[in-house]
């Protein structure tokens, strides 16, 4: 039983110690307990425990069910060919539920899906079968670098948030941060077509105010991300919209534009998908 709980549980203290043993030793107990409450550790572990018989795509679907979260999907053109190999790219407005919905929906239409994620999410062990970890704050481990490359060379469908972090309030509008060009480079290298998507939704005003304050104070650590689990639980009973645009052939990503220029063009197509559905 203890072994099973270890597999299922998210443990903030263990995560901190895994990333920085020195920090874990220096943090007062009341700070660790505060972080546990802030990220809803007990509620997350209850969700995982209640669904202990599921993992990967099935678990994502069960979590959405338990949170009473629904979604509608709108296509603007042709649907991806079930026999194709794709990189599905999307804006990242929520920081949690948007990923769960993409895993559930794309995973229900394709046999094998992989999601490129922050390596911290690997601590959610039951979702690890669909996660491919990247280190956003340092060098990637050699085995993770190999897994990253092997994933693009495989037949699995790939889910990707090119911004890396969830959306922020920019010039009064909720919008993604700069998209990184990696997905364009990997699409060309691995001969994968790209499917642009737009996901509706936003976080609370407090989340964006804290992000703005943190930036004004010159704090580099994205402390607002600690609020993302709370943002997820706040959205119980919510419904979202996912807009899916026409697949973009990798053969069309020619030298007339740089990879970064293609990245920005595809970002525009992603945001435009919400206005072009049939």
Predicted regions and their residues:
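Membrane-anchoring hydrophobic helices of lipid-metabolizing enzymes
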Residues: 1-89, 99-101, 110, 128
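Non-catalytic C-terminal accessory region of glycerolipid acyltransferases
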Residues: 2, 12, 145-278
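Short gly/ser/thr-rich secondary-structure transition/capping motifs
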Residues: 67-74, 140-142, 224-226
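Conserved beta-strand termini and adjacent loop/short-helix elements that scaffold enzyme active sites
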Residues: 74-76, 116-118, 134-135, 245-247
